Amino acid sequence: RKEVEQDPGPFNVPEGATVAFNCTYSNSASQSFFWYRQDCRKEPKLLMSVYSSGNEDGRFTAQLNRASQYISLLIRDSKLSDSATYLCVVNIRGGSQGNLIFGKGTKLSVKP
């Protein structure tokens, strides 16, 4: 089993739809979790940090289930500009640097 697993997609959704991505991780000692967004041929940018059970920011909600070792990202009222690759990132050691493991990413395409 890989350290971090994601469904690669692509998810094709109409504008305004709600879409959810799931990600599982194999190291139960992991302390912190992140969702990054990557636009075509650009550096990934931090979208959301998830430390306890979840986090919410506008149309984006991240949830963490430590017992099942998965995190999810929910995007409500999707917009054309949400089209990107979403990377699930797990810090498998403590500390600020730790050891970040990136998932392969889930591709989202929002259509008008």
Cite the ranges covered by each PLM segment.
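Extracellular domains of the immunoglobulin superfamily
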Residues: 1-112
